[in-house]
Amino acid sequence: MFSNVGWGEVLVLLIVALFLIGPERLPGLIKEVRAMLLAVRNAISQAKEQIDGELGEDFREFSKPLQELNSVRQMGAKGFITKTLLDGDDSFLTSFNETKQDVKDTVDTVRKPNLRESLKADKTKKSAQPQPSLASGSADNGGIAVTQQSNAGESRSSHDSPVADAAEQLTGDVGSASEPKEKPSAPGYGWEDVT
């Protein structure tokens, strides 16, 4: 009730009371106020004891479900499932935790954590050596060599890609149409389809 009243405010109240009431009656008034506050405190404690005596058992029975609800609220989803479905036996969930950890370990080994840093490191290592064939664009235009991409786990080699195989076949066919693979020495070669 008086928790936010400071000592300065109490001093101001005493000075005002001293002027209003007078110095002769102030000590008697302080004793009366003190006795009144003690009487109120005793009345409140007696009322609490009487209510606890009459309604104590009923109140405790009523508060048990509320306490269970609070405990369920605090335990979280895993604890709630364990308590309700598995009767508190969480040994069933440990196999899921092991499987989850195995999957996480597998994913971590497959995934490279710092792909860009590994590409930059590979690029600086390879810059001293001759550049391999580029997959798309040149190194100046931001292209990344196929070997660098495959080292980073980003791309496959050109022999595994059906698109690259088809492109190679098309470019190979165009080259064979313009120039024969071998030049025959026999006269009349190449005139078979003209008749």
Curated annotation (Swiss-Prot):
The chain crosses the membrane at residues 2-22. This is Sec-independent protein translocase protein TatB. The Tat system comprises two distinct complexes: a TatABC complex, containing multiple copies of TatA, TatB and TatC subunits, and a separate TatA complex, containing only TatA subunits. Substrates initially bind to the TatABC complex, which probably triggers association of the separate TatA complex to form the active translocon. Residues 127-139, 146-155 have a biased composition (Polar residues). It is found in: Cell membrane. It comes from the Bacteria. One of its GO terms (cellular component) is TAT protein transport complex. Residues 103-125 have a biased composition (Basic and acidic residues). Residues 103-195 are annotated as: Disordered. GO terms for molecular function: protein transmembrane transporter activity. The gene is tatB. The keyword Cell membrane applies. Part of the twin-arginine translocation (Tat) system that transports large folded proteins containing a characteristic twin-arginine motif in their signal peptide across membranes. Together with TatC, TatB is part of a receptor directly interacting with Tat signal peptides. TatB may form an oligomeric binding site that transiently accommodates folded Tat precursor proteins before their translocation. It is a single-pass membrane protein. One of its GO terms (biological process) is protein transport by the Tat complex. Keywords: Cell membrane, Membrane, Protein transport, Translocation, Transmembrane, Transmembrane helix, Transport. Belongs to the TatB family.
